[in-house]
Amino acid sequence: MTRVEQRLAAVNVTVALVALFGGVVTGLFQALEYAGVEIYPALAPIVRSHYHSVSIHGVLNALVFTTFFICGFVPFMLSRSLQAPLASARLGWLTFWVMAGGLVLASIPLVGNAATVMFTFYPPLKAHWAFYIGLTLVVVGTWLVTLNLVLTWRAWRARNPDRRTPLAAFMALVTFAMWTIASLGLAAEMLVLLIPWSLGLVSGTDALLARTLFWFTGHPIVYFWLLPAYISWYTLVPRQAGGKLFSDPMARTSFILFLILSTPIGIHHQYTDPGIHQGWKLLHALLTFAVFFPSLLTFFNVTASLETAGRARGARGWISWFGKLPWTDPSVAAQVLAMVLFAFGGVGGLINASFNVNMVVHNTAYIVGHLHLTIGTAVTLTFMGITYWLVPHLAGRALFSRTIALVQVWLWFGGMLIFSPTLHELGLRGMPRRTDIGHISYMQPQWKTLLPLVGIGGAILFLSAVLYFLNMVLTVAVSRRAPQPVPEFAEAVSGPDHAPAFVDRWKPWLALAAILIAIAYGPTLIRLAITTPLTTPGLRVW
């Protein structure tokens, strides 16, 4: 690995953390509004409404923070795993500037209240054309990352024809292969429907076709967020905790299943949409339950790996190994606590996928609570844990304060234990999501008793974030000690040689993924494309 990979990781992670800061601040505004604190009049004209705040929060956290962090961290891991530089430094820098340019272009209308369409940007809500083109450029940048990773791997393979691809590199390639396939839906929505519509080249669009193309990408993007966290959980955390990965072949199998199953499941977000046959909705429901299986493999494999670490540190009982983990290491503590809360988020996701039970929670605050257990904890807290070693390494300076880091990690865990279950309960009591709750005329008594807890949980999360950013800034600007060594990759109890050779072949898995997508999406997309008139005009509500 050269300084180029480190600099590319540094600039991408920097943009990601700046975006996270903006998303956290706007998240506090929404939590306070839930608690009955009228804050938006004091923020005008910077933040003009609840929906302006939600749009900024969603785009910065769910799209910008995650994408830039992943595009910094995953190539870093692949390069380090292969012990080889990226194939093209120029391509790496071109990628960053394409993405950064797209971010600036999209941010101008977003901040200016000309793209208050939330991070799903469903039509007929209409944003400024710069918002759509900017986000499209960010997606194009991720494709360039995929190209660089593949070129790097092929160069490594030419030098090592008989070696099994190292696990971290294998997972990095699967992550971006899955995302490149899945992002084609979003690209089609942007290029065919939204950009021409926003530029005035066509008079209308269609909400159902746009939503279907969005969810072609919109659910797989969850795995684009999660799989980099899994890379750390599988390849680094067992070693950081003092143990070994339980099974390398099982880890590879889980990622292959994610590659095959992550995309043909998006219609489970559209159970209530007319115009899609119930049979296709049922197929997507079954496939959504199927994609839960590789997460179960991950749960078993990572838990077994942590148990080996706890027992290596002296534990003897069935449960006591958990207490023997190195809880004084903020990187480990953050990621293990992220795993704990994600277990509940994963199980809760089965309710969203269920063909009938989904009707109880659909478009309620339950979904907000679920999303904050997945991206808000499993992803965000894991990425925070990663930065506790990655930022010191990139800056060449030791983490400023492990104590502050540990306090931050536990505050995030505690705040989310208040914030997310309360939103789940509010959803079960019928409170809608994506609604300006502070100004509704139909407030229910059973909601009023719980809403202050959302504000309390959100305030604790914000305090945790303040400590996190303070620690990051002081690490870069003030710390003078040398950093700790970068965590080594974990050895495996059952190593890569125990996996069949065909696991390392790409064509069968990519072909199977394409066939399954064609079956699950082909008939619906073809029918909608042929029969749907593009007549829906644009609306700007806020």
What role is predicted for each listed range?
Residues M1, A158-R163, A309-T328, S479-R505:
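Membrane-interfacial, low-structure loops and terminal tails that flank and connect transmembrane helices
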Residues M1-V11:
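Generic start-of-chain signal for non-secretory N-termini
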Residues A9-P41, V47-A84, S88-T116, W129-W153, ...:
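Hydrophobic cores of alpha-helical transmembrane segments in multi-pass integral membrane proteins
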Residues M118-F121, D273-H277, V357-H362:
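Membrane-interface helix termini and inter-helical loops of multi-pass transporters
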Residues P124-A127:
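Short His/Asp/Glu-rich catalytic/ion-coordination signatures at enzyme active sites or charged loops
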